[in-house]
Amino acid sequence: MVNDNYNTAEGIDSYYLVNSKHKYSITSPSPLDNLLVLYGLEPIAKSLARTNADGSKGVKLRKSYKNHIQDLPGKHQIVGGQKPIPAGLLDPMVAQAPDIIKELDPELLSRGLRFEKTPINGIPGFNTADLAINDQHTLMRGDDMSENDEFGARRSKRKKKAQNGTDSKRQHI
């Protein structure tokens, strides 16, 4: 019988990471104890409480801990953003490089900014099929449906009802 219990314990040990032969002691302090009182943190907890014991509003906390760290030495405000480093310090060769931006040709500029009406035949050499929006545009608008379609017929019927002088909405009594 003793042998059977030992085999059972061995079987449990092979499946679980708990040693059945070891005796575990209860930890101290227990999580069930009042840890604030045990470690003397109750006065700090009361100073940070949002409500007092009588239910009235306590100290309104700021979103920062500025009030709580004022007694510590040093600066308590964040210094403004970093100042930009001049490009000459980052790459000294930039200052030695010549300015390579050239002026635009005035004639080219005037031709490029001339606004004329588009010819009746459209812009020469321009094909709207190259943009690949022609098919999608007609699908979005519904231009590709003929009037004999199911949806086209419904639209025309609704228009005819409205044209006959009858109100298409129901009147509630």
UniProtKB/Swiss-Prot annotation:
<keyword id="KW-0010">Activator</keyword>
<dbReference type="InterPro" id="IPR013942">
    <property type="entry name" value="Mediator_Med19_fun"/>
</dbReference>
<keyword id="KW-0539">Nucleus</keyword>
<comment type="subunit">
    <text>Component of the Mediator complex.</text>
</comment>
<keyword id="KW-0804">Transcription</keyword>
<dbReference type="GO" id="GO:0016592">
    <property type="term" value="C:mediator complex"/>
</dbReference>
<dbReference type="GO" id="GO:0006357">
    <property type="term" value="P:regulation of transcription by RNA polymerase II"/>
</dbReference>
<dbReference type="GO" id="GO:0070847">
    <property type="term" value="C:core mediator complex"/>
</dbReference>
<keyword id="KW-0805">Transcription regulation</keyword>
<dbReference type="Pfam" id="PF08633">
    <property type="entry name" value="Rox3"/>
</dbReference>
<protein>
    <recommendedName>
        <fullName>Mediator of RNA polymerase II transcription subunit 19</fullName>
    </recommendedName>
</protein>
<feature type="region of interest" description="Disordered">
    <location>
        <begin position="139"/>
        <end position="173"/>
    </location>
</feature>
<comment type="similarity">
    <text>Belongs to the Mediator complex subunit 19 family.</text>
</comment>
<dbReference type="GO" id="GO:0003712">
    <property type="term" value="F:transcription coregulator activity"/>
</dbReference>
<comment type="function">
    <text>Component of the Mediator complex, a coactivator involved in the regulated transcription of nearly all RNA polymerase II-dependent genes. Mediator functions as a bridge to convey information from gene-specific regulatory proteins to the basal RNA polymerase II transcription machinery. Mediator is recruited to promoters by direct interactions with regulatory proteins and serves as a scaffold for the assembly of a functional preinitiation complex with RNA polymerase II and the general transcription factors.</text>
</comment>
